[in-house]
Amino acid sequence: METGSTEQMVQYGKYVYVNCWSYQNRILKIDTTTDKVVDQLTVGIQPTSLVMDKNFKMWTITAGGYKGSPYGYEEPSLYRIDAETFKIEKLFKVLLGDAPSEVQLNGAGDELYWINKDIWRMSVDAERVPVRPFLKYRDTKYYGLTVSPKNGDVYVADAIDYQQQGMIYRYTEDGELVDEFYVGIIPGAFCWK
């Protein structure tokens, strides 16, 4: 089976789910006892992130491709997928031309965050996306995002111009800027112990 490039994985029971990102539109279900793909789910073009919330719902956001792409161009979307049934429960459309990415969860698994120019946040139980962002765009190149599992602080990576040292901004869960510091070039991922 051709998978293209894969991006992220989450586990539910004996299954691992992985999103196929580059020029793909699938999430694969892999049985960890046999290491075989046992199912696949079609979503929008280029699912960029994959997380599992407190209700055992998976979330992915699709990039939608780009104008002129041989693979296609469509509205990006945020998907809520039931891990037990491996079915799409809810689809939240994003505007054509937007570039959403970096779906993350807080430590409790009940608040979802993502980048779409601004930083957005919503409850995993919400039935619609918010109308106002959690953090407004600051004339930056938001490139990475994470939420501290211990205290809920939100860390945003800024690639600046993709040539110089990047910047990390740390906000409280209420959106108050508490720290900023330089890091290496093009910061794009975080890891928690």
Place the predicted regions along the sequence by residue:
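A short loop-to-beta-strand structural motif that recurs across blades of beta-propeller domains
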Residues: R26-K29, P76-Y79, D118-W120, M167-Y169
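Repeated scaffold domains used in trafficking and secretory/extracellular systems
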Residues: G4-Q11, I45-D53, G97-G107, D139-V147, ...
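Blade-level signature of beta-propeller repeat domains, shared across WD40, Kelch, NHL, RCC1
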Residues: M167-K193
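Residue position within the beta-strands of beta-propeller blades
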Residues: V18, W59-T62, Y113-I115, V156
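Structural recognition of the beta-propeller blade-terminating site
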Residues: D31, D82, S123-D125, Y169-T172
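Short coil/turn segments that connect the beta-strands within blades of beta-propeller domains
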Residues: G13-K14, N55-K57, A108-D110, K150-G152
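Short glycine/acidic-enriched loop and turn motifs that connect beta-strands
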Residues: S22-N25, G64-S69, D118-W120, I160-Q164
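A short beta-strand motif characteristic of beta-propeller blades
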Residues: M1, D35-L41, K87-L95, R128-R138, ...
